[in-house]
Amino acid sequence: MIEANHDRLSGALDGVRVLDVAEPLGVLVSRILGDLGADVIKIEPPGGDPSRNLSPFVTLEEERLSLPFVRANVNKRSVILDLDRRDDQQRFRALAEQSDIVVSTEGIAAWAARGIDLDRLSIFYPHLVWLSFSTFGLLGPYSSYTGNNIVAEAMGGLSYIQGDDAKPPCVSPCEQGVYLASIQAAFGALMALWERRSSGQGQLVEASVHEVLANLYFLLVNYGLWSDIPYRIGASNFMPPNGYYPCKDGYVFIAALMPHLWEKLVDVVGDPRLQDEALRDAEYRNEHPERVDPILREFTARFDRWTLMETLQRHGVPAAPWSTVADVASNAHLNERGFFIEFEQPLFGKLRNAGPMFRATASPLRIRRPAPQPGEHQQEVLAEAVSQVKREPLPAVAGARRGLPLAGVRVLDLSRAWAGPYGTRYLADFGADVIKVESAQFADPREPGNPGYGEVNRNKRPITLNFQTAEGRELLKRLVAISDVVVENFSPRVMAKYEID
């Protein structure tokens, strides 16, 4: 692949302005939009954003820097406004008139007290996408409740399935619930922004951490079909081999659920006890883990974790070593791909951090500016508020009616199993024509009768192609040619094998 000169390329949201009034729950939402190229203006209260006080800190003489704050607030400019004062409310409204998206974590009453009626945004701010991001949403019996990541994970059912069944539930580390919901919220704002291209109008978008987490892991669909309430499996293996196995210096994770992966693992281990025909059945292995796990533990205990990972991967078995944070920071693969980035943080010098969440060759995500000091950009932003004209609604496309934002977009879905189909389902839910291509030779491990299959493949049109024939490959190329988006989760060599590079 030819590497582009990223310094000369614009971001996907170049020219889009975002007002960030999302302290501290929603700061990652606007960070995502900033990474995509948007001009994000962070509105901080007098005294600064409370998330500046989140530990851990880097301390230099009398100054201290919150690392979580830096992580969530690069690519932003900072302005101090007291939104309880009338003059600053007017300044905020002037900025809103010149912005495309507002990201807020406060409710209807708080904004009404400041003279902004969220029910009448389309009248006073017809161009604006207003994203409300909160624990429980704008309306409903819990909408006024105080919430955070732990509260949302408990209420959304995520904590219930985490941990050991004999012990209390566990919360996920590093506020994963809020992180996941932030990605969903940013996606919602992008969908509204895309819809504005045809309708010319903005809209109010709600994203609730509670609802995002309640939508995970097929919990509701399984309960709706079978009244199934899962138990917490802790570190035990579900459908072995699928879990951590001990090594000389730690653990390795092995995931060989599908039949061809099981066969490869059996060949590598070379133990005749695993060659029993009954063990080819994943359900049987799940019911009799004592016939699998002890043998695998004997095998894995002979190796160090990195050697075992390389051995298994060389034979096509998915495996990864248990990694400490130090292991991740020194990981050869991440470093060679340039995943880690360094940027200059005022007062503290050079910081090393994780890079953007995905790569785009023509509109790369990148760090354009460090996390700001409180009010660092006060004068320039307020001067822009005076000098710039307010943004008007865009002219609507002739004959366009408001509807699903991705209507008219065609997506060719070649992905299998979980991650790919789940992603394309979101595109289908928002109106894209998603054509799901399956192969008779390599059936999706989630069978059509499985509720998980239906959950990730709703709103799609399925077809079957035989990629092993010239006719099948030609049909695949024709489908690629008439699609706007192609999604696949094959290993890197597969698409080239089908003559699509």
Give the predicted meaning of each segment:
Residues M1-S198, Q373, H377-D501:
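N-terminal helix-loop segment corresponding to the beta1-alpha1 unit
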Residues V40, Q313-D327, Q388-K390, V434:
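Short, well-structured beta-strand/strand-turn elements
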Residues G47, T135-G137, V209-A214, D249-Y251, ...:
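Glycine-rich beta-alpha junction loops
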Residues F69, R232-N237, N242-G243, A256, ...:
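Short Gly/Pro-enriched turn/cap motifs at secondary-structure boundaries
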Residues L138, K167-Q176, R197-E211, Y231-N237, ...:
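Conserved Rossmann-fold dehydrogenase catalytic segment
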Residues S182-Q203, N215, L219-L225, V266-R273:
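Oxidoreductase and adenylate-handling cofactor-binding alpha/beta cores
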Residues P240-H315, A319, A326, G399-R402:
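Aromatic-enriched alpha-helical interface/lid elements that frame and gate functional surfaces
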Residues H315-R368:
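A glycine-rich dinucleotide-binding beta-alpha-beta segment and adjacent secondary-structure elements
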